[in-house]
Amino acid sequence: MAPLRPLLMLALLAWVALADQESCKGRCTDGFIAERKCQCDELCSYYQSCCTDYVAECKPQVTRGDVFLQPDDEYRAYDYHEETRHNTSVQEEQRIPVLLAKTEETPVLKPEEEAPPPGPQTDDLGVPEEELCSGKPFDAFTNLKNGSVFAFRGLYCYELDEKAVRPGYPKLIQDVWGIKGPIDAAFTRINCQGKTYLFKGSQYWRFDDGVLDPNYPREISEGFKGIPDDVDAALALPAHSYSGRERVYFFKGKQYWEYVFQQQPSREECEGSSPSDVFAHFALMQRDSWEDIFRLLFWSHSFGGAIEPRVISQDWLGLPEQVDAAMAGQIYISGSALKPSQPKMTKSARRSGKRYRSRRGRGRGRGHSRSQKSHRQSRSTWLPWFSSEETGPGGYNYDDYKMDWLVPATCEPIQSVYFFSGEEYYRVNLRTQRVDTVTPPYPRSIAQYWLGCPVPDQK
């Protein structure tokens, strides 16, 4: 028996080492470790790679900082009509001196003189200047991996924050993306890499953190076989989990096509790139028991490639026959919950409204100053549930309050999709594929709710 003792000791040590490698004990803050057989990082639920004791050891929670509790255009909870009256009065106060100044500077024409015919204004290079609130239709919208929204119109592009256009925009598409505008469509994949695709004519370009990938542009017929050239709009959706497949909807004329990606990047492949905040927000929600809902929302019956076209107005109820642009909104949580006592709202609370965590600022050196004043409306009315990261119910800032709570089990995630047509936009519930019925109703003004343009005078 004596010779067996060393063998038993070795077997015991090997078992202990194996058990330690397959446990999250002491590993909850270590992040992803490729050499380990199972993982304890915050994305392991999505990749279905968690150790068996992940929940017990790491106690993951979907907390108030991980979820959005209203659609993109419903981030404020204080009274919509009061805000409208406030904005209108401010605009009237600011409009009077501007009009007077213009009146004083207008030259008086002599009888023999005639005013020159109106024409488009151009810059020194002969490029037509962009007018923010012109009401002209947009060509594309997309939500970049850092949470910023980019809008494309004609030769120009805009970066939008929660309230208006960011300082320094519009800029020429060619100066920012290296492509001469206009473009036809754009989308950003919702996976750990978060690459952005721009479409124009028969070609498409792919960008990683704003840098064009090698060997691009490519032909649409090669990279997206079965999808037509000159598309009008594109819309990307995530996979329900790592075992699922991502989808893109392409729209052209009165029809739309569904394209299914055959694979998504692995966890190891994403270690070398900056994380996608949009994807991280989605993946963190895998911690809760919403697998069935995610499968319902993001399931695809195709094994990859394009699916035969269908009619827009038949499947997306409430939309016009044709659309100019489309974009998936942030997933938000719908349901009932007890509201904590509401402290007095401060000015700083009203101004807060960050979409994603602090990594959002990691862009291509864009200005992120929020000092510019905006007339932008809240993009809709409100829901009396939770909050975005920095604002609680009613737009209140709870950063100074100790609040640790879980999303109630009765809640469920809602995926909104935005469609833009002409000077208006629609919000659609992906699960029902119907335009949301809210007040004020859809369609709504793009200029007012997305660009921060003044509210029209209400008589």
From Swiss-Prot:
Pfam hit, one: Somatomedin_B
Keyword NADP set for record: no
Disordered: annotated span: 338-380
Record's GO cellular component terms: collagen-containing extracellular matrix; extracellular space
Intrachain disulfide bonds: 24-28, 24-40, 28-58, 38-40, 38-51, 44-50, 51-58
Keyword match Transport: no
Subcellular location: Secreted, Extracellular space
GO biological process terms, semicolon-separated: cell adhesion mediated by integrin; cell-matrix adhesion; immune response
Residues recorded as bearing Phosphoserine in the entry: 289, 378
Modification Sulfotyrosine occurs at: 75, 78, 80, 398, 401
Start and end residues of each SMB domain: 20-63
Post-translational modification: Sulfated on tyrosine residues. N- and O-glycosylated.
Biological role: Vitronectin is a cell adhesion and spreading factor found in serum and tissues. Vitronectin interact with glycosaminoglycans and proteoglycans. Is recognized by certain members of the integrin family and serves as a cell-to-substrate adhesion molecule. Inhibitor of the membrane-damaging effect of the terminal cytolytic complement pathway.
Subunit relationships: Monomer. Interacts with SERPINE1/PAI1 and C1QBP.
Comment on protein domains: The SMB domain mediates interaction with SERPINE1/PAI1.
Protein name (Swiss-Prot/TrEMBL): Vitronectin
Gene giving rise to this polypeptide: VTN
